[in-house]
Amino acid sequence: MTNAKINSGDPHPRRRVAVLDTEMSYVDTGEGDPVVFLHGNPTSSYLWRNIIPYLSELGRCLAPDLVGMGQSGKSPASTYRFVDHARYLEAWFEAMNLTSNVTLVIHDWGSALGFHRATRYPKQIQAIAYMEAIAMPMRWEDFGEVEPIFRRLRSEKGEQMILEENFFVERILPGAILRKLSDQEMSAYRAPFLAREARLPTLVWPRQIPVEGEPADVTAIVESYGKAMSQSALPKLLVVGEPGAILRGRILESCRKWPNQSEVKVKGLHFLQEDSPHEIGAALQEFVKSVPQK
């Protein structure tokens, strides 16, 4: 299974739906209880292309592109804070009529959005699988060797790095994957951000990371859902990257205390789906089969 091919091509057609003042693009394949895949920065539903096939015979697999990302429309007001994405995503959940037995498969900022939703609508969620997640507010020491980069992104230098150099896509993304992405894969990740002004979401996201109490609103949200998850009996699957990037050290040890949780280790840095999609897919398949039906 480890030697299975990682496909550059994405076999899943995209649909579109109106949400608030824009449109969102999404994958919708399979039938049954919904399994919702949520990506983060600077990726899209393309991240899940090799994983969705493992679940599409077990349920209805949905993977949206967050607003301003992937093939989704932009925010007309250019508002891409966490609370803005949460608002758009809530409208998308309503449009999809996802009100019960939802399994969330979440990564990066998609994890924050997913945990937040699970905390607000616990009766709608059946299970959560998470990887390289934003599980608790961070300290600068948690960033390790990339601390200087993220400090710069949160300073006035961030505009040059992101808007002019497309830094998140060109440097951070490939630098957080063990293997070398193909030209086709890099083209897919670049596609939403070819224009300077289109890169704004990838600049706002690193400035939303809750570090040392800032921004205050995101810090409060992350603290709240972290506490909720630490007390929740919801079935959980923790996918640990080896060596991983953001979910390690004290944060990983804290997550390991969450109840009703199983754990699987896969090779990878931050974008585990690009290094170990088949291992993740197989683990998710087993996890979804094991979750008691409501």
Predicted features and spans:
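A short acidic, amphipathic alpha-helical/loop segment
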Residues: 50-51, 250-253, 279
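Catalytic histidine-centered segment of alpha/beta-hydrolase-like enzymes
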Residues: 269-281
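Histidine-centered active-site/metal-ligand motif
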Residues: 39, 107, 270
